[in-house]
């Protein structure tokens, strides 16, 4: 039986643009708007609900975000929709998208983006809000080409890309609007790992297998969540404040059952059996 089969019942969010299923410590969230999985306000509402569902489910320790089909992870915002809405709604649309992706970043659980196809514009901006990005080798290109439409990447691209690749490289990539393969993305640090999976199904299986290495009993998910919070929050404040946050989070972890099990297993020279509490 595949790892995908071990997940629970497939659930479709209210607008029909995101699906959700979970099991074995992992929530699999899929953008479902073929052919290119372009996003709209309705999709962001669905994605927002999926993130909150995973956040509040104690059984979920890792989130995996993918796109339906094998051509696109996400092609970004639906241009046709953007042309048909008012300037005020455009602003509110961008604001809600920013809030949704911040919710993804603020969720104290590991979030992995599985890029099994093209990942451009707002699609890359969604992926940049994830903690790790795994791409299927040769399956597509990525980039932020919004400048070719006379606008800038408005769903966090100017901020998150520069934090990952540095300011000058980020400006060059966005000002040129060029797209590039996942192999170059790996060199730039935009992608953390390339998968050699030969099909979309095999790629999803490899993502789930990778995600489960961060779940109990293999890993201490509370510690992973605190590491994420320390890094994400700490990089935005002075070093001294970041160190203070680190100490507070460490103190909370010292009181956890997983920390006691980790230290006990180390002393007993055996593999720890973490419980996620």
Which stretches of residues belong to each language-model region?
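Acidic, divalent-metal-coordinating active-site segment for phosphoryl/phosphodiester hydrolysis
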Residues: 121, 177-184
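Conserved CoA-thioester-binding segment of acyl-CoA-metabolizing enzymes
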Residues: 1-66, 102
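Glycine- (often His-adjacent) and acidic-residue-rich active-site loop
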Residues: 46, 67-100, 119
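A general structural signal for well-ordered alpha-helical segments in protein cores
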Residues: 44, 158, 167, 204, ...
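CoA-thioester-processing core
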Residues: 100, 104, 114, 120-174, ...
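C-terminal long alpha-helix characteristic of the crotonase
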Residues: 53, 135-140, 182, 191-244, ...
């Amino acid at each position: 039986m595949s790892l995908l089969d071990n997940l629970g019942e497939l659930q479709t969010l209210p607008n029909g643009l995101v699906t959700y299923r979970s099991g074995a410590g992992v929530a699999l969230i899929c953008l479902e708007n073929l052919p290119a999985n372009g996003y709209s306000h309705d999709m962001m509402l669905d994605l927002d609900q999926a993130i909150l569902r995973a956040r509040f489910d104690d059984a979920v320790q890792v989130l995996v975000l993918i796109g339906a089909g094998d051509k696109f992870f996400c092609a970004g915002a639906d241009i046709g929709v953007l042309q048909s809405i008012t300037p005020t709604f455009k602003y509110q649309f961008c604001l809600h998208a920013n809030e949704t992706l911040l919710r993804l970043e603020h969720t104290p659980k590991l979030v992995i983006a599985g890029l099994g196809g093209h990942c451009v514009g707002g699609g890359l901006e969604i992926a940049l809000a994830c903690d790790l990005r795994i791409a299927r080798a040769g399956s597509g290109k990525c980039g932020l080409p919004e400048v070719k439409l006379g606008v800038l990447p408005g769903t966090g691209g100017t901020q998150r890309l520069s934090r990952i690749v540095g300011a000058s490289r980020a400006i060059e990539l966005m000002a040129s609007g060029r797209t590039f393969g996942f192999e170059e993305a790996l060199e730039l640090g935009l992608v953390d790992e390339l998968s050699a999976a030969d099909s979309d199904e095999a790629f999803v299986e490899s993502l789930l297998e990778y995600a489960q290495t961060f779940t109990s009993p293999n890993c201490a998910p509370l510690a992973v969540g605190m590491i994420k919070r320390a890094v994400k929050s700490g990089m935005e404040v002075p070093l001294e404040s970041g160190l203070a946050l680190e100490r507070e989070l460490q103190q909370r972890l010292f009181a956890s059952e997983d920390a006691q099990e980790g230290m006990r297993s180390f002393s007993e020279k055996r593999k720890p059996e973490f419980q996620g509490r």
